[in-house]
Amino acid sequence: MKTQFAIFLITLVLFQMFSQSDAIFKAIWSGIKSLFGKRGLSDLDDLDESFDGEVSQADIDFLKELMQ
């Protein structure tokens, strides 16, 4: 009975390790595909649009109001 229980626990641990490693490999592979795919490269350009280098007078006034 002890041997069967030990084999059961070892099998359970091995199945758990296999399922977690499969999920990790899928996440790594999807990350690689998103970096080199056309959609992945176009999605990286969205960050450039979020930064606006120009600061308007309204922005300066708002910052001055916050600092008071």
Swiss-Prot record:
Compartments in which it is found: Secreted; Target cell membrane
Keyword check for Amino-acid biosynthesis: no
Cellular component terms per the entry's GO annotation: extracellular region; membrane; other organism cell membrane
Pro-peptide positions on chain: 40-68
Tissue expression: Expressed by the venom gland.
Alphabetic keyword roster: Amidation, Antibiotic, Antimicrobial, Antiviral protein, Cleavage on pair of basic residues, Cytolysis, Membrane, Secreted, Signal, Target cell membrane, Target membrane, Toxin
Coiled-coil residues: none
One MF term in the entry's GO annotations: toxin activity
Gene Ontology biological process terms in this record: defense response to bacterium; killing of cells of another organism; regulation of defense response to virus
Modified residues (Phenylalanine amide): 36
Function field: Amphipathic peptide which inhibits the growth of Gram-positive bacteria.
Annotated family: Belongs to the non-disulfide-bridged peptide (NDBP) superfamily. Short antimicrobial peptide (group 4) family.
Further information: This peptide has a significant inhibitory effect on hepatitis C virus (HCV) infection (IC(50)=7.62 ug/ml). Furthermore, this peptide potently inhibits HCV before viral entry into cells and kills HCV rapidly in vitro.
Name of the protein in its database record: Peptide Hp1090
Provenance organism: Heterometrus petersii (Asian forest scorpion)
